[in-house]
Amino acid sequence: MESVLAQLFKERKQDEFVGGMPYYGQRLLGNRRWVGVTLASAFIVYALFNVPSQTFNIFTALGMLADTATGQASGRQSALYYGIALVLVSSCAWLILGGIRRVTHWTNRLVPGMAAAFCGLSLLIILLNIAAIPDFFALVLGGAFAPDALFGGSMGIALAEGVRRGLMSNEAGQGTITMAAAVADNDHPCEQGFVQAMGVFFDTLVICTLTGFIVVLAHLWTGSASSAEWAAASAARLDVYVASVQALTPAALDRTLVILVSTCYALFAFTTLLGMISFAEISANLISRSPRFILGIRVLGSLVFVPFGALTVLAGLELGNLWAITDLSNILMVYINIPLLLLGAPLVYRALAHYRAADGGRFLSATIGVQTTHWVASEQTHLPDTEETSPR
């Protein structure tokens, strides 16, 4: 639904589209500019404050990759970590300052490959332990319907963790992925709704399920068969996952698989970081399209918040409180976005009815009783097929 609204109310900026939750929020709430500026500002703050946590994830993954490859543990004050910081800041600056088209040019090449590699590696590990699959289902179903899980604190803890990690994984209903939906060049708004729905399915039911299989099969996430150490597992997510991979993999393959899994994890975090800053830039266009203002957002993300995240790692600081802030900000974005979805639902249903009646044919916003800047006869042209643009 939110992706369809993002498509409906997107706007054209030279050779690219901009849009998302602040844009459709402004239109749905009376087209008041102050509403759009407020929503855009809220998202920019949200996105930029998520950057340090992703920076931390990148360091964690690359540090583990290097430790596994060399067989030696590297401290945060080592030359390795300073090298990671230098490469990370430089690559982010080059990509972000080059504009959204440059970011999408590279992420479109990284994301499919890393997703396919991660799924393939996960399936390989599961197949290597296929004899333990019945134990997996017995543990999951037995734990879910045990009296202490149903009526005790375990259910509440599991539910809270599930909601937080679910939002973190697919962002459904949160409004924070709508900027990506808006920039897509579609023939009908509902097309992007179907694409984003598949994204939620893939993130949650494929990626998360494969990860869960490995963690539960290894059974390293519990102190005992009946007592889950949630706090410890939450504080060391990648450590627990990598240890699970090692426990389930033959000794001849464990180092190779850990290196590959760590690489996938680092790429996931890196592309998420790029996405957050790019989405902040898209939202900033609603406040001002001044080239200086947009450049300022790019600089703030790539040369302030990314280095800040790197410095927190090099200083040896733990980001437990930052994760708590991230979880809170995710919930706040849901509370902002859900009322907007309720307001926009009639338009989405009308657009879907048109999509079915016209079999995905030409769409004009006037057919569902709303005027937009893009879905009019004079704007029905596709974007030029260019992959990179210089900073504007």
Each model region followed by its residue ranges:
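Flexible loop linkers connecting adjacent transmembrane helices
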Residues: 1-30, 224-249, 282-288, 350-360
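Helix-loop-helix module between adjacent transmembrane segments
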Residues: 2-15, 21-22, 26-56, 62-95, ...
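Extracellular/periplasmic helix-exit of transmembrane alpha-helices
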Residues: 2-9, 14, 123-139, 182-184, ...
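Juxtamembrane helix-boundary/capping and inter-helix hinge elements in multi-pass membrane proteins
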Residues: 9-19, 28-31, 67-68, 172, ...
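Membrane-interface loop-to-helix entry segments
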Residues: 39, 43, 56-62, 79-128, ...
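Transmembrane helix-loop junctions in multi-pass membrane proteins
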Residues: 49-61, 69-72, 92-104, 124-136, ...
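Membrane-embedded translocation segments of transport machinery
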Residues: 98-182, 200, 243, 250
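A generic transmembrane alpha-helix motif of multi-pass inner-membrane proteins
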Residues: 128, 291-353, 362-392
